[in-house]
Amino acid sequence: MTRMNIVRCRRRHKILENLEEENLGPSCSSTTSTTAATEALGTTTEDMRLKQQRSSSRATEHDIVDGNHHDDEHITMRRLRLVKNSRTRRRTTPDSSMDCYEENPPSQKTSINYSWISKKSSMTSLMLLLLFAFVQPCASIVEKRCGPIDIRNRPWDIKPQWSKLGDPNEKDLAGQRMVNCTVVEGSLTISFVLKHKTKAQEEMHRSLQPRYSQDEFITFPHLREITGTLLVFETEGLVDLRKIFPNLRVIGGRSLIQHYALIIYRNPDLEIGLDKLSVIRNGGVRIIDNRKLCYTKTIDWKHLITSSINDVVVDNAAEYAVTETGLMCPRGACEEDKGESKCHYLEEKNQEQGVERVQSCWSNTTCQKSCAYDRLLPTKEIGPGCDANGDRCHDQCVGGCERVNDATACHACKNVYHKGKCIEKCDAHLYLLLQRRCVTREQCLQLNPVLSNKTVPIKATAGLCSDKCPDGYQINPDDHRECRKCVGKCEIVCEINHVIDTFPKAQAIRLCNIIDGNLTIEIRGKQDSGMASELKDIFANIHTITGYLLVRQSSPFISLNMFRNLRRIEAKSLFRNLYAITVFENPNLKKLFDSTTDLTLDRGTVSIANNKMLCFKYIKQLMSKLNIPLDPIDQSEGTNGEKAICEDMAINVSITAVNADSVFFSWPSFNITDIDQRKFLGYELFFKEVPRIDENMTIEEDRSACVDSWQSVFKQYYETSNGEPTPDIFMDIGPRERIRPNTLYAYYVATQMVLHAGAKNGVSKIGFVRTSYYTPDPPTLALAQVDSDAIHITWEAPLQPNGDLTHYTIMWRENEVSPYEEAEKFCTDASTPANRQHTKDPKETIVADKPVDIPSSRTVAPTLLTMMGHEDQQKTCAATPGCCSCSAIEESSEQNKKKRPDPMSAIESSAFENKLLDEVLMPRDTMRVRRSIEDANRVSEELEKAENLGKAPKTLGGKKPLIHISKKKPSSSSTTSTPAPTIASMYALTRKPTTVPGTRIRLYEIYEPLPGSWAINVSALALDNSYVIRNLKHYTLYAISLSACQNMTVPGASCSISHRAGALKRTKHITDIDKVLNETIEWRFMNNSQQVNVTWDPPTEVNGGIFGYVVKLKSKVDGSIVMTRCVGAKRGYSTRNQGVLFQNLADGRYFVSVTATSVHGAGPEAESSDPIVVMTPGFFTVEIILGMLLVFLILMSIAGCIIYYYIQVRYGKKVKALSDFMQLNPEYCVDNKYNADDWELRQDDVVLGQQCGEGSFGKVYLGTGNNVVSLMGDRFGPCAIKINVDDPASTENLNYLMEANIMKNFKTNFIVKLYGVISTVQPAMVVMEMMDLGNLRDYLRSKREDEVFNETDCNFFDIIPRDKFHEWAAQICDGMAYLESLKFCHRDLAARNCMINRDETVKIGDFGMARDLFYHDYYKPSGKRMMPVRWMSPESLKDGKFDSKSDVWSFGVVLYEMVTLGAQPYIGLSNDEVLNYIGMARKVIKKPECCENYWYKVMKMCWRYSPRDRPTFLQLVHLLAAEASPEFRDLSFVLTDNQMILDDSEALDLDDIDDTDMNDQVVEVAPDVENVEVQSDSERRNTDSIPLKQFKTIPPINATTSHSTISIDETPMKAKQREGSLDEEYALMNHSGGPSDAEVRTYAGDGDYVERDVRENDVPTRRNTGASTSSYTGGGPYCLTNRGGSNERGAGFGEAVRLTDGVGSGHLNDDDYVEKEISSMDTRRSTGASSSSYGVPQTNWSGNRGATYYTSKAQQAATAAAAAAAALQQQQNGGRGDRLTQLPGTGHLQSTRGGQDGDYIETEPKNYRNNGSPSRNGNSRDIFNGRSAFGENEHLIEDNEHHPLV
């Protein structure tokens, strides 16, 4: 092995060791392929090298923003993680999901055979084998969890948490610089990372203590999910969150700060950059006061938030700091997105263009990615997300995935995580921890959670692992580590006496029913935050408050409907000693309690005030319901409903004209006919500048007693000369009001009048208008960085844009001489390359623009200087008593830049900051939100003022407004429409802007206004006002100019006057760019070897232009220059076609160098890669070499023939044997198509008859062969023809023909013979042996209808002789033994697939699912096919493994079908329950009724759970052959030619089979009621039916006896025993009556797979059809035979009699019965009445719902009297009459409570009409307005006057 290979191997080995030390994930103990491992190592090594290069590059160019670095680093990190996961292993956590050995234990490692390694093999092969044995990435995404993380004070300092999960295996993260968590279970906080505490300390230590840098912060490269809150607060030096959390996908929000899940607050240097974040599952977003943080409002936060708690509070603080920091947040596209499919887009309203689509950006280079599956339409619920290609992830994913359709590749789980996979819910034996993952009970109880620095007991109850109890449970007072189930409904009492001012506090009382104390709610937030909908559920459980209810300042509340269950306020304490309910200062409250709420107050009154949207009529409704008189002080009509539209008179205002500095309004005059006209003063027009159109703006916004943001103009009312009012009113605002161009104004009109009786006010809605454009000021041009092919220019926006600046026009042109002039004199003596100097540039200049004066005829908006000059004129204030001194103008210019703060916003911000500091300094609990919340009874001064009800300040209409002057420069326009300049010299521009890759600039079309010059329109959305002119020539002088233009689609728009800013600038040169590429230098000999022509390609990019080239010919020996040629790059000269010529060269070795000279100077020297060899030709010519190659090829051909002959001699026989085997096993050579062979028949060989059957995979027809002989020599006439019903090209059709292929290999007596295949027609036909009697299952079921058969007598062998039964079982076993000998697995052995011919011989058929097992012990199918679940073994159900032993299991099920005459296996169970019954519970079918122990032992042998414990078919044939006929022995495959003899050790012994549950129970003389075991109501099963054989109908006793009455046979019956096992719980599986009447099994095509039609008279009805006498009238004799009951002691109820002769079964909702329509004469199907109750006129019925018909009242009375006498005899049984328990086996349970029936529940109270109704099932037809339905909760007998005994 070479030294280089050794070095490479050692290097790879070192990489693996390093990866193992980093401990990123577990390893798997299986091998991987050579290619995969090599690629993984190669990729890792290459990525590490690239990463080092990038790091070195960033060290030198750290000031350049690299937008692609993050993606490259992420890809590298992901590849490293894959290799690390495949090599390393971490320790086991309580959740075993971290261990990859869960499914591949270490003891089962794949062994490697090294015997083939020869001694000559190098060490490389051995190392590769060892490498492949250990490198195997896990199939699932491994989860590594961390608890809550708090980084504080220093970037690397992780503080210990007070609140922990208490995981004993939790790892301490202190001191780590890189945390490898994938999930943080809790919140992650970065706070107070400040180098200096105060500004004085910062100034003092600025030079000694620089701020922290980005590289010092801890990184989380693998973190995908934070289950709590992400908080970044007061952190310096942190520039980009992308570098800290490069893969963060999901923020859970299970614990919130206030109601926010993402908080970024007061961070001076931060950029968000969380471009992978796709889901915020709960909570809102608050991002404020971050001075340099841009793009906060470009993200669609509402799209990320999936819950109704979606309050978003973000600002763009960088815009307010523009004059201080010089930073302006850019607008526009951040990534190129053709077709708008890659990025997400926001829709913003624009007055001129309507709705505008704006690209959502995280930064200037990264947009918010779009995924069609983040939300599921049309519900908009959370979706699974997308993978990297945009495809839909698995439904259990959230936030995206690595691979589609793979629940193990999710970034986060939608529901629950368990063992590396996302699942819907935990299994029954597991417990849900933290609402996200499953743990075992032992793992749960190991946890010791710490809440508030105190350990609390953990509990594992009802599938929940938590410190609190689940719903319906409460803490056990005797043991606080346990929960106990509540008796009835849990009543949770919460002792609170604090303010509910945050959403987490509200969540803490979600389960509370009784509030012990005062409930004060003060939740601030946006109305559209969705909190109101969440609070609706939070307060829904409260029904009692012991104190008072106070709702104040809660903006999310629209109504108080969330207290829908509030019934009582005890008011033990009163608010202000007066009020039990207080509601005030709720700005959005529109309604009070729901009209259905039945609320009572024990004492106190109600106070409702200052709710501006609450109409007074709702207050009156509430007071009327509470029976409390209205009080004008407590329920003030004047302070409620001020902003609501309760009663109003609207004024419709129209705009008649709009100019740049004026707006004209008009409206109809106000109707004053019904008021005192002398009191009407006039109209006042209010207006103010607004940033945007806000449909929700109100008149009261931005107003106080001192400062009013609205300006106003008053117009006095005058009557006309005739005394009539003016029909229309006209007003305008103009230069005197300092109206500015292109400014949006809000306005409204209000009337002014003196208060008097009957006065009415008029007010208009708020409208919006934007003034017109005016010529903008010119921009100011500045120069920035210059590069070799680009010039970065910057400029300042016009001081007065006077319109929406849509774009800037940038023009540039070359100002350079042609290089061809210099090329003419390049090779002259005076211009040698050595003496050439660099070209000198003309002086670079900047042309200053002159300010443009606005014509004096127009009044413009005042500038800052003019406003300061008129300061004295502004010092005025409204004459309002108590008004504060006006300070709006006295404030400094810096303060004037900021908007006057809203008092309520200040209160909300203060509350948020207090809560934030509490959370940071006192971290909350991880397990849950604390129920004991700290007292928050603070009341601010603002709230104290608000609580002074009836003293709300009012604004006088005559007050003069103050004008707030903004001293900021106007911001650029946000318009994105394409301009069309009006300057004649400019060309038309394109309509749709594009985006420059890697920049923030949105561009329009580049055009060339003049020859040699270019221009481009740059969108004004680029708020940094800069542009990089790219694709410039290197080292070239350019002239640049700039102008600003407005939106040309708007009338009056224009560009700035032609005084454009200008500059001259030369681009930089590029070192070595003038070099000729070495590989392009070529040479060739000319006429002889002494003449060489050298050619090359010129440089593609040069520094300004090429003047010429210098070509040198050097000696290869000493490097001396032999010849030099100089050539100028003149016009028409070609270096490739012409080049230079060297002549008269001597023999030797030379190389060529070429030097290009550009405008900048001589470039580097380029040398040819191939040397020039000049020599005289020798012996080895081309002809000689070709002849030698020909001889070599001949010798190689001879050697190949020898090798071929040797292989044929040595290995020919083995290849032949393998070929023969593959012919016998065609499935090894399946090529997905059927090939016709000798079995092929012609279509006219058979005649197709009528259809005789249909199965899951096709139809069967009768056929007749036309004297045809099959390939096996069978001449056949009648035959069966199978035809597939699917598409001929489908996969099922191929499987159908493959079945025929399989049958070609079989030739035995007990397998259906194949006669041939007709594949030339569509659909194809398979011709088989005719089996006249059909399949075994249907044949057995047909025997049930035989009159000889009586199930109650167990006369099974009277129907099928015992020897015939043995014969059939032996024939099936012999056929399966034949398949077993051929290594074939049938996979679908069932009675339906066993066919019977006319001499009652059973043969095995239907090989559609058969598979070959020659090389494997079992067969595991792939794809999706129908499977016979009820005939499958446990290993087949769970693992999909099939072999001969699984067929043995199916044979046991076939025996069950035989002894039950074709009964459905596992009757009463669904397919999922069958899987649980067999695979999980490991149970088998209980012994059928009338089944002999011998056969049940054989069944149990076949149903052994372990496959190796089951017998083989060979053993079963020898066992059954002892009782079989001699004919069978003559035809048996096992007992004839093959002589497959068993050893003594292989013989079966039935005595070893357990006899449990096989012996018949002892029959008692009479049923004993006391022996019937009593069950609790919760343990009863309503599906417990009675076997049919226990009933026998007898003829009527006399003419008056009800035909519905049934009695017990004279034979004493066995008392039903209490079922105690899972087998006996499924009682329907124990009877031999066959399948239920309507068993629903939906799976595939026939009765065993899908729902089928059923026959009548099959199984008994449901047990609860009977009713006792005392169940209805308290022990009286009435209701003798209602609901199918009997009036005879000892007689049962109509359990076995069908409802109306098969019309309906009387069963509800269970799979055992089918609901069918019944005739109008029938009562409801659940009555269970006998068939004789119907079919007679509907007259003189004694009772409803199936009562027996009586011909007269006397007959009914006589029968009732007899029943009453029988009832008296039952008094010792608790007063019960004809009880259901008189019949053992009915499932009725006696009640321990005296006088009550255990089968029924009292639902009706006692009233004047009856004594109550314990029946739960309804009443007569006349209930429910005469409809035919019966009432579920009504009385059984309603009409008392018709009672015969009343």
Curated annotation (Swiss-Prot):
Belongs to the protein kinase superfamily. Tyr protein kinase family. Insulin receptor subfamily. Changing residue 401 to Y: Dauer formation. It holds the Pfam family Recep_L_domain. It comes from Caenorhabditis elegans. Residues 961-970 have a biased composition (Basic residues). Residues 944-980, 1718-1742, 1769-1826 are annotated as: Disordered. It is a single-pass type I membrane protein. Autophosphorylation activates the kinase activity. Interaction with shc-1 may inhibit its activity. This is Insulin-like receptor. It is found in: Membrane. Residues 1246-1528 form the Protein kinase domain. Glycans are attached at residues 113, 180, 364, 453, 518, 652, 671, 696, 1017, 1047, 1078, 1087, 1093. The active site is at residue 1388. Residues 1205-1846 are cytoplasmic. Its EC number is 2.7.10.1. SMART domains: FN3 (SM00060), TyrKc (SM00219). The lineage of its organism: Eukaryota, Metazoa, Ecdysozoa, Nematoda, Chromadorea. CDD domains: FN3, PTKc_InsR_like.
